[in-house]
A protein has these predicted regions:
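A short, solvent-exposed beta-edge/loop patch
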Residues: 154-231
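Short, solvent-exposed coil/turn segments at beta-strand boundaries
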Residues: 88-90, 117-120, 184-189
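Surface loops and adjacent helix of pleckstrin homology
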Residues: 43, 62, 96, 194-195
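N-terminal cysteine/histidine-rich coordination modules
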Residues: 2-75
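Amphipathic alpha-helical segments
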Residues: 78-95
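Short acidic, gly/pro-rich beta-turn/loop elements at beta-sheet edges
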Residues: 60, 137, 202
Length: 231
């Protein structure tokens, strides 16, 4: 039986829990662009660093698909935390991730979902919202830079999502073995990454997205097993 609980998205995570969480970040944070281990701040610098990409926003270990995992992400989020609602038939929420620390807050959010591929077999979807320059979505897409890069939005959009009752166009980014779409919502990049690439047919129709930071909504969210696609 899939665990389901009604969700009031007002965060209820204790401050002490966040203290434990950031202790984990210090030990295991990685670069959002390449997933190499990140070097923690020192007495001389408050910045996290990657040996390849320099100063970064640290990516914490994936959070389990649960109410606690969701509330922990929403609590510190400075960017949207986006979930398709209603969920596509048969799909479950399968985990969360975020990039940021106590000083900056969460500047990139990732929500993972798993379900049936419209063309057959299983599929996974990561929805990432991030400030420009963070690089989590671009890293998953296999792009060399932190953002979509040259040529972005130079053609007609390939798909559309609806956020807060406003349509947001998305463009397809070339990527091996997966379908990657990216657009802009409220000055943040929004990436939808789907495995396998045939699961991109899920976006043949506009996909409505909810920002889970909105404290007025109550959603009965179904949780599944943790998705291995989460970085």
């Amino acid at each position: 039986m899939t665990p389901r609980r009604a969700l009031c998205v007002t965060p209820r995570v204790a401050v002490t829990g966040m203290g434990k969480y950031f202790a984990i970040v210090v030990m295991r944070a990685v670069c959002p662009r390449c997933q190499r281990p990140a070097r923690a701040p020192t007495a001389w610098s408050s910045a996290w660093r990657c040996d390849l990409h320099g100063e970064i926003c640290p990516l914490a270990p994936a959070r389990l698909p649960s109410m606690d995992g969701l509330h922990a992400l929403v609590r510190q989020a400075r960017v949207p935390v986006l979930l398709p609602w209603p969920l596509p038939p048969g799909w479950l929420v399968s985990g969360f991730a975020g990039a940021g620390d106590e000083r900056t807050g969460t500047r990139a959010s990732a929500v993972s979902l798993s379900g049936p591929n419209p063309l057959g077999g299983p599929a996974d979807l990561l929805i990432i919202a991030e400030e420009p320059g963070i690089g989590l979505g671009a890293g998953l897409a296999g792009l060399p830079g932190p953002d979509p890069g040259d040529g972005f939005a130079s053609s007609q959009p390939n798909a559309t999502v609806e956020v807060d009752h406003h349509d947001a166009p998305l463009w397809l980014v070339e990527s091996d073995g997966k379908a990657v779409f990216v657009g802009e919502v409220a000055a943040n990049w929004v990436w939808l990454v789907l495995w396998p690439d045939t699961a991109g047919t899920l976006l043949f129709e506009p996909l409505p997205l909810r920002d889970l930071r909105d404290p007025t909504q109550e959603l009965d969210v179904p949780f599944g097993a943790l998705c291995p696609r989460l970085p």
